[in-house]
Amino acid sequence: MADDKGQMMWGGRFAATPSAIMEEINASLDIDRRMAEEDVAGSRAHADMLAEMGILSVADNEAIQGGLDAVIEEMRAGTFPFRRELEDIHMNVEARLKELIGEPAGRLHTARSRNDQVITDFRLWTRRALDETGQLVAGLQAMLVRRADENTSTVMPGFTHLQTAQPVTLGHHLLAYVEMLERDRSRLLDCAVRLNECPLGAAALAGTGFPIDRDMTAEALGFARPMANSLDAVSARDFALEALSSLSIAATHLSRLAEEIVLWTSPQFGFARLSDQWSTGSSIMPQKRNPDAAELIRAKASLITGHFSALQGAIKALPLAYAKDLQDDKRLTFDAFDTFNLCVRAMTGMIETISFKPDAMRAAAAKGFSTATDLADWLVRELGMPFRDAHHVTGRIVARAEAKGVDLADLPLKEMQAVHSAITQEVYGVLSVEASAASRTSYGATSPVRVAEQVAQWKQRLRVE
């Protein structure tokens, strides 16, 4: 940082100023100015503590608090005079404070280093971001629950290997993502609990000889406690790494849902139609309706995972305590949160407005011998057949149906009896896709009754109207 005479605030031992390129690579203001509110909050708490401990006079603290009021008002009004040559938000705030109140501004940094100042701001910002992102995820969950509630009995094919497996209900399918997102939200909340320790007072790395009260500043900033080791306090970035890990996992779940939207809205599947709000066209092919938002979510999920890997790579070989490698931790973290939150908003909008096609889903569910397991189960229940024998018999019946080009429900009884003579007309009662889905009544299963129960539980948990 440069003072009014152009001298860097850390430049007392240097004979020359940094080159323009050095200033360019060293500057972080464009990124960390987002922590302005957190920086001012940290300075307020620090100044109050210094005054309480008699390190700072009451008059100086009053001047500092008044100056910080003016600083934050300027920032909120968009009139704060940011100066890029001052490197970062922390030095910009201090320089402006000095312009506003004079000498007392220079006392604010007593018993504090930029090392503990920066990481305090970063923890405060990340804690708030985790809470905001968790609320967005809950909003997407609520939207999925609403759409599931509309489709508790809508039958569609369930897939393994992207091949028709068994009939399921659309409501059940959508609730699977609600469960995934709940784990994602839980990880975000857990991360917020672990990061909620205050590094302020660790100073550069070894603590300070001033009689500070770290419990006081921790409480003022809403932290559970001060961090117990000053080296760890300024060195640790695992809280950011954990946040990016949680975002990466959650983004992976968004990507899976996005991929299914791409598939379902294709003419080959025809299960759904995206609204015009969430579709784009082609510059040459007038008939096209492209699911660009879903495709972009897939791509951006990879970007978030890349940010996690980049931060992990930056941290993995760093000795204690601080190194400038850590400056980009905020660039990666801020962009990961921004990107993820954008994806959640886009996905919520798509789910809210997507039109499902129950008839097409039902027709697809009836193909591919999706009720073969139901036939095998019937052989076990009604004829007392061991399941492995029933599996073999069913396979032979499927082969006959395939040879005749019909589904199991349309295969004549005599064809089934040619495989096993004890099969009766009653078998057809389990071979419709509706009967198949309805029969899956175990806890967590796909029957409309079970799905309705799950919807009711989620409505209560998420307070969905």
Curated annotation (Swiss-Prot):
Any one cellular-component term (Gene Ontology): cytosol
Name the enzyme's class: lyase
Q: Name one GO molecular function term.
A: argininosuccinate lyase activity
**What protein name applies here?**
Argininosuccinate lyase
- Originating species: Hyphomonas neptunium (strain ATCC 15444)
Provide this UniProt record's keywords sorted from A to Z: Amino-acid biosynthesis, Arginine biosynthesis, Cytoplasm, Lyase
Name the catalysed reactions.
2-(N(omega)-L-arginino)succinate = fumarate + L-arginine
Q: Which InterPro entries match?
A: Arg_succ_lyase_C (IPR029419), Argininosuccinate_lyase (IPR009049), Fumarase/histidase_N (IPR024083), Fumarate_lyase_CS (IPR020557), Fumarate_lyase_fam (IPR000362), Fumarate_lyase_N (IPR022761), L-Aspartase-like (IPR008948)
Does this entry carry the keyword Amino-acid biosynthesis?
yes
HAMAP family, per database record: Arg_succ_lyase (MF_00006)
- Write down the EC number: 4.3.2.1
